[in-house]
A protein has these predicted regions:
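Active-site helix of classical SDR
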Residues: 18, 26
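Conserved SDR Rossmann-fold cofactor-binding beta-strand/turn motif
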Residues: 39-49, 101, 114-116
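Short, flexible catalytic-loop segment of classical short-chain dehydrogenase/reductase
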Residues: 45-55, 59, 64
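C-terminal substrate-recognition "lid" of short-chain dehydrogenase/reductases
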Residues: 86-115, 120
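Active-site "substrate specificity/gating" loop of NAD(P)-dependent dehydrogenases
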Residues: 8-12, 34-35
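Catalytic Tyr-x(3-8)-Lys segment
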Residues: 61-92
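Alpha-helical segment proximal to the catalytic Tyr-Lys
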Residues: 31-35, 106
Length: 121
């Protein structure tokens, strides 16, 4: 899923609707299959340092045209409420998914886990 399912971003209505559908499906499937011990949990990353953020111009390596080096990145960092420096990487999301599949995630189902550094508190 994505944090876009729960928070409005301009020009992303179709994307947000698709992610909202994943959220609703996660809840419904968890209710349907809980008696069989099957768990469903949506993982909703915020801005993650990846090819998608690189293409959007918000990563440190790919700043927007006409701005001084690191300008877009610095603006984005000011919008984050401060867990760490910069965006999480794909390995952070992978760690959460691994936890969900382990005994540590045994009581997590029918919900969404946001990985957004506190952006959407």
């Amino acid at each position: 899923s994505s944090t876009s399912a729960s928070f409005a971003h301009p020009y992303m209505a179709a994307y947000a609707a698709s992610k909202g559908g994943i959220q609703a499906m996660t809840h419904a499937l968890a209710a349907e299959y809980s008696k069989q011990g099957i768990r469903f949990t949506a993982v909703a990353p915020g801005s993650i340092s990846s090819g998608m953020t690189d293409a959007s111009g918000t990563s440190k390596e790919n700043v927007g045209p006409g701005l001084p080096d690191d300008a877009n990145y610095e603006v984005m960092m000011k919008l984050l409420p401060a867990i760490g420096e910069g965006f999480a990487g794909p390995e952070t999301v992978a760690g959460v998914v691994a936890m969900l599949g382990s005994v540590d995630g045994a009581f997590i189902t029918g919900t969404e886990i946001r990985i957004d550094g506190g952006t959407h508190m």
